[in-house]
């Protein structure tokens, strides 16, 4: 699996054997790449800046983490996948109870209709997704100001819900130590989780890291591990 980026000769390759890092020291190109990736999570169209080599949509494969502490674990993409998996796992006994709940809700609607002196509308059709929304089920990860634990929580969440998703962390190295990064890399490799670190400055290097550096003059090269 590869990503190509306009103005960068070297493609970004992804593997379960190493983590991938793009170090862009040209601030204008860095900003252009980041804007494209963030926008891709909300808009679906062909991008001129960043593309998968097989034409796959960025939003279908990338989970963008621009800010570890404010990452939205309740995003539509995450919640919809979680609901889908829950609905596949729920057994018949639960479904029978759901029918009882649906009957109760219908009776409440009928009572409201009989009790008011004007016409009303109320729902009579419910599905499991509706009841999950009522429960407001959503993931929970460490909320305290511990960046490393938040990163672990995000990796665990995405790895549990999705197959073949790439987690894209932006400027994470600037917030953690070399030792913390090493532990994060080990976690990703052990879980076979594809990750992509995008950095705007020169930083430390890990032996399990494949790094593409783009200097200020837009010259791209692979950095030795």
Put a short name on every predicted segment.
Residues 147-163:
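GG-anchored amphipathic helix commonly corresponding to the ABC/SMC/Rad50 NBD signature/C-loop
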Residues 178-225:
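Alpha-helical oligomerization segments
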Residues 93-100, 104-108:
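Long, charge-rich alpha-helical interaction segments
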Residues 1-84, 179:
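Glycine-rich P-loop/Walker A and Walker A-like loops and their local beta1-loop-alpha1 context
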Residues 12-14, 158-161, 187-191:
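Conserved catalytic network of the ASCE P-loop NTPase/AAA+ motor domain
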Residues 27-29, 140-145, 171-177, 203:
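Short acidic, S/G/P-rich loop/turn micro-motifs used as interaction or catalytic elements
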Residues 159-177:
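Conserved P-loop NTPase "ATPase switch" module shared by AAA+ and STAND
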Residues 105-146:
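Conserved P-loop NTPase mechanochemical-coupling segment
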